[in-house]
């Protein structure tokens, strides 16, 4: 039996993107056992993966600070011996813990995030498609002598209980078999990545004019939930999912959708990892950085028309404040044009429904 230790603590989308790689590594290496260091909230991403153990460090108490990180190293070392350590996060915390492992004689392999080439793209605005994050993860395993070929979605699984709960809810909201089930995820962590609720209202109206559809609203914290409740009131066929279900149930529900329309956000990743058609809307960030919806056609990436802005992309993750009062890049994406694109792409068609 071979054991390896893998680190990826955050963020939500980045942790989700480890799933295709870890699942495939486990599938193709029957003797391998993986311990993944991550956060408890992300546990549903890894449901059903055999020989995978999740470990949740207590970074607020027991494993806080330098002494705490050394304690984390000691706690993890007791779970070994590990053949190798794979750091898919490469931040100060993981660098410290992996340093202790390296000093104890355990080989450590760290992700190459491509920071220099990403920063060069921001500085020069010369756009090219960089390696996808999942491939960077796979390459890190390759450094450790574990080759992996990422397969096709769906990658994320869910429990029977989550499926039954989600299916019951969804079918209760769908009046007819040939009704489109569309997920909407209007929010992201930063303003330059948000299209705006008024645009979504207009898009809902346009779709309702020509299609039988039901819309399900995903994502958002406490502040965003209040805004999503207002969006829910826009039409009787719009239903708020966020805040009502567990993450496992949301994953199961996403899998049943015909289409997800999302920002550059974790729900974009969850939908594409679930094998659902995913339309992603990009403003201040850019899919070329390697965080695009995995397995989705380039045509599904909605971006501002070229030639109007010289400031895009402004940052890798959208954390840099926009130089304009409101993100001009998002204002250039019109609901009418997005609707036309959906029609052209032929994505407004419901999947066959089995009773």
Regions found by a protein language model. Name each.
Residues 1-355:
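Catalytic machinery of carbohydrate-active enzymes
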């Amino acid at each position: 039996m071979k054991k390896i230790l893998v680190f990826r603590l955050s963020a939500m989308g980045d942790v989700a993107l480890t799933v295709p790689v870890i699942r495939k590594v486990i599938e193709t290496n029957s003797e391998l056992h993986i311990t993944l260091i991550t956060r408890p909230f992300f546990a549903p991403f890894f449901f059903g993966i055999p020989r995978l153990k999740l470990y949740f460090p207590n970074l607020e108490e027991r494993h806080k600070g330098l002494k705490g990180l050394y304690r984390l190293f000691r706690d993890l070392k007791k779970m070994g011996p590990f053949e190798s350590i794979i750091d898919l996060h490469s931040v100060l915390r993981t660098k410290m813990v992996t340093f202790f492992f390296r000093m104890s004689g355990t080989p450590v392999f760290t992700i190459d995030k491509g920071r220099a080439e990403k920063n060069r793209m921001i500085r020069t605005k010369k756009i090219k498609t960089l390696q996808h994050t999942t491939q960077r993860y796979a390459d890190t395993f390759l450094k450790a002598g574990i080759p992996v070929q990422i397969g096709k979605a769906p990658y994320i699984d869910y429990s029977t209980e989550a499926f039954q709960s989600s299916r019951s809810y969804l079918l209760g909201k769908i009046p007819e078999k040939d009704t489109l089930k569309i997920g909407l995820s209007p929010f992201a962590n930063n303003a330059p990545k948000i299209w705006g609720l008024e645009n979504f209202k207009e898009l809902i109206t346009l779709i309702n004019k020509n299609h039988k559809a039901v819309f399900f609203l995903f994502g958002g914290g406490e502040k965003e939930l209040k805004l999503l409740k207002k969006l829910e009131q826009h039409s009787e066929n719009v239903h708020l999912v966020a805040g009502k279900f567990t993450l496992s149930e949301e994953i199961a529900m996403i899998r049943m959708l015909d289409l997800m329309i999302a920002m550059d956000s974790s729900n974009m990743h969850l939908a594409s990892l679930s094998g659902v058609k995913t339309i992603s809307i990009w403003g201040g960030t850019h899919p070329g950085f390697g965080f695009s919806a995995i397995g989705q056609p380039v045509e599904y990436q909605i971006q501002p028309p070229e030639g109007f802005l010289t400031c895009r992309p402004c940052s890798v993750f959208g954390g840099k404040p926009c130089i304009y009062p409101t993100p001009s890049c998002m204002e250039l994406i019109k609901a009418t044009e997005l609707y036309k694109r959906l029609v052209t792409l032929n994505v407004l068609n419901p999947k066959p429904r089995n009773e």
